[in-house]
Regions:
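Juxta-kinase regulatory segment immediately upstream of eukaryotic protein kinase catalytic domains
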Residues: 1-5
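Active-site acidic catalytic loop and adjacent metal/ATP-binding pocket
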Residues: 6-21, 26-28, 160-204
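Conserved protein kinase catalytic core
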Residues: 35, 88, 182, 199-201, ...
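Active-site activation/catalytic loop segments of kinase-like enzymes and analogous catalytic loops
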Residues: 53, 204-243
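Active-site catalytic-loop/activation-segment of kinase and kinase-like phosphoryl-transfer enzymes
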Residues: 82, 114-164
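Helical subdomain adjoining the active site within ATP-dependent kinase catalytic cores
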Residues: 142-143, 243-246
């Protein structure tokens, strides 16, 4: 059968194409060793395997909210999954425009809590995602170490955070869980972009997620109360559901 494709923009970590193949619509991604950034930002392209595996596990746990995995080309670091509908909007864009749908918020935090619960203290998950090298390259180095390079007085605090995050794992951490990686179509959501997945501490997902909401209170002060209220409700829901820690 014939196929056609369009390249997608917006990401820094790889080449992405929207592929039309018969009755299927796919997103196909190929990882880059040097990310598309002004400064040097290197990362092993084998992270596509991690993205494929994390996407697969998320789809097994919350299939209603995560696209299906179609294939993985190990030799060329290419990963293919079902595409979210083209009618989707990015949740981040909705929030920045003042559209606050608390049903979407519930689905987002409920999905995260289910994955954290299901994958907690799981030897198979630890086997697949136990190597935190990619997490270091994609999060610790560009976020924490880069900041310390500009503000050396933060070194002691940063070292304690690094030790905590790089220490013993508890569950499957998404690593990039934020409104920019959750697409919305009506009240259906699609959770995407799993390449920072690792067996780590769930506090990272909560902090990363919360940070995006707190930044929106600065960006759009007129909706700050609504933003913090939504975040509080989501965190309360998360902590009411987690079963693997006090």
């Amino acid at each position: 059968d014939g196929y056609s494709f369009n390249y997608c923009g917006g990401g820094v970590s790889g080449t992405v194409a929207f592929v039309y193949a018969g009755d299927k619509e796919l997103i196909v991604k190929q990882a880059l060793a040097q990310l598309k950034t002004k400064d040097t930002w290197l990362c092993d392209p084998k992270r596509m395997y991690i993205e494929k595996e994390a996407n697969r596990i998320y789809n097994e746990i919350v299939p209603e909210n995560v696209p299906e995995v179609y294939f993985y080309d190990e030799d060329n670091y290419i990963f293919g999954r079902a595409a979210a509908p083209e009618s989707c909007t990015m949740w981040k864009s909705d929030l920045l425009s003042g559209l606050y749908d608390f049903d979407v918020a519930h689905k987002a935090i409920d999905s995260l809590s289910k994955v954290h619960n299901t994958c907690a203290n799981n030897a198979e998950i630890e086997r697949i995602f136990g190597d935190k090298a990619l997490f270091y390259d994609l999060r610790i180095s560009p976020y924490i170490e880069f900041t310390v390079g500009k503000h050396p007085d933060l070194r002691a605090f940063a070292d304690s955070v690094n030790e905590f995050l790089m220490g013993d794992g508890i569950t499957l951490v998404h690593g990039d869980y934020s409104p920019k990686n959750i697409m919305v179509d009506g009240r259906k959501i699609y959770i995407l972009d799993f390449e920072v997945g690792h067996y780590g501490h769930p506090a990272f997902d909560l902090a990363f997620f919360s940070n995006h909401f707190m930044l929106k209170t600065v960006k759009n002060k007129q909706w700050a109360d609504t933003t913090t209220n939504m975040l509080k409700l989501m965190l309360d829901e998360y902590f009411s559901k987690v079963e693997f820690m006090d």
